[in-house]
C-alpha cells in the first residue's frame, strides 16, 4: 500500500492516484528549492506588469507550531481549525493557541475558517470529525474561544458551507448566543470580522443577500466551488483542472462585482501549486487577495507579476 502524509496540512491520502503523486512530487521539489536560498522575488512588491497591486496570504493549520510568515506573505489568509478539534483541544487550549497566533501575527490579518461537520466530506478525517461534533452546525467551544481571543489582534472568522442567507443568519445567531453567554459571565471578549466562505454555488448566487445581512468578508474557495458547481464532489483532484471553467468564473465574477459594490473584500483561498496557473483569470475578474499554500506562494507571485492587468 502507498500513502501520502502531509504533516503541514494535516491530511492523509491512502492509495493516491498519479495526479496526486505528481502534485506532491512538485511540492517536495519546490520545498527543497526554497530551502536552499532565498528567492529575491520574495522581497519585491506585489505588483503586476500593468501596475495592479495584489496581496498574498498564507494558508496554515491551527495546530501548527508557529505562525508562518514566509515568501512575502502579508498575513494568514486561512487558518484551518479541524486538526485542533481532532486533537480534542479544550476551549481554554483553543483560546490560548489563538491568542498566540494573533500576538505572533503582530497586527496583520488572521483569517480562521471555523470547523464545520459538512466541510471536506472527502477528507480522511471527515467521519471522525463528524462523529466527534455529533452533527452540530458549529462547534460551540470554538466560537467561544474565538470571541475570547479576538482582543489580541486582527482576527477574521469565516464560516464554510453556508448555502444561503438564512444559513448565514443561523451562523450569526450562534455567534451572538455565545457572545451573550460570555458577557453575562463577565468574560472579556472581542468581536472579530465575520465573513462567509463561498464554496457552494448557492452561496455564490446569494452572495449579495449574505453581505446585506452582515458578512464583512467573502472568501472564495475556488477548488470546492468548482467541485460543487461541476459535480466533481467524489473526484476532487479533477477540480484543479477545471478552475477556469466558464460556469465557475461566472459565479466568481458575480461575487466579486457584488462585493465591490458594497466595499466588501474578497479573497481566493486554498491555492495549491497545481492551482497556480489558473489564478491570472481570477486576477482579471477583480480578485486582489490570494491565500495560498506555502509551496505555492512564490510561483503564484511570479506568475501574477507577469500579468498585464
Cite the ranges covered by each PLM segment.
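Metal-dependent DNA phosphodiester-chemistry modules and their immediately adjacent helices/loops
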Residues: 8-9, 17, 245, 306
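Conserved alpha/beta-domain cores
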Residues: 33-309
Amino acid at each position: 500500500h502507498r500513502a501520502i502524509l502531509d504533516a503541514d496540512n494535516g491530511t492523509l491520502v491512502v492509495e493516491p492516484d498519479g495526479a496526486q503523486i505528481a502534485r506532491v512530487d512538485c511540492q517536495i521539489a519546490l520545498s527543497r528549492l526554497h530551502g536552499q536560498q532565498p528567492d529575491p522575488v520574495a522581497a519585491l512588491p506585489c505588483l503586476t506588469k500593468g501596475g495592479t497591486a495584489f496581496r498574498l496570504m498564507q494558508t496554515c493549520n491551527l495546530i501548527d507550531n508557529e505562525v508562518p510568515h514566509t515568501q512575502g506573505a502579508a498575513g494568514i489568509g486561512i487558518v484551518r481549525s479541524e486538526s485542533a478539534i481532532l486533537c480534542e483541544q479544550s476551549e481554554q487550549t483553543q483560546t490560548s493557541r489563538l491568542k498566540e497566533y494573533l500576538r505572533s501575527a503582530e497586527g496583520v490579518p488572521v483569517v480562521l475558517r471555523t470547523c464545520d461537520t459538512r466541510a471536506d466530506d472527502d477528507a480522511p478525517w471527515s467521519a471522525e470529525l463528524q462523529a466527534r461534533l455529533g452533527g452540530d452546525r458549529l462547534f460551540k467551544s470554538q466560537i467561544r474561544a474565538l470571541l475570547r481571543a479576538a482582543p489580541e489582534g486582527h482576527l477574521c472568522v469565516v464560516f464554510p458551507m453556508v448555502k444561503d442567507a438564512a444559513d448565514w443568519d443561523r451562523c450569526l445567531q450562534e455567534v451572538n448566543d455565545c457572545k451573550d453567554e460570555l458577557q453575562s459571565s463577565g468574560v472579556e471578549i472581542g468581536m472579530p470580522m465575520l465573513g462567509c466562505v463561498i464554496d457552494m454555488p448557492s452561496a455564490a448566487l446569494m452572495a449579495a443577500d449574505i453581505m446585506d445581512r452582515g458578512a464583512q468578508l467573502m472568501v472564495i474557495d475556488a477548488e470546492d466551488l468548482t467541485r460543487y458547481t461541476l459535480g466533481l464532489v467524489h473526484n476532487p483532484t479533477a477540480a484543479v483542472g477545471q478552475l477556469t471553467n466558464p460556469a465557475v468564473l461566472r459565479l466568481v465574477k458575480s461575487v466579486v462585482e457584488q462585493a465591490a459594490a458594497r466595499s466588501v473584500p474578497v479573497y481566493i483561498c486554498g491555492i495549491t501549486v497545481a492551482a497556480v496557473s489558473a489564478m491570472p483569470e481570477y486576477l482579471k475578474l477583480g480578485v486582489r487577495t490570494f491565500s495560498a499554500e506555502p509551496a505555492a506562494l512564490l510561483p503564484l507571485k511570479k506568475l501574477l507579476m507577469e500579468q498585464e492587468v
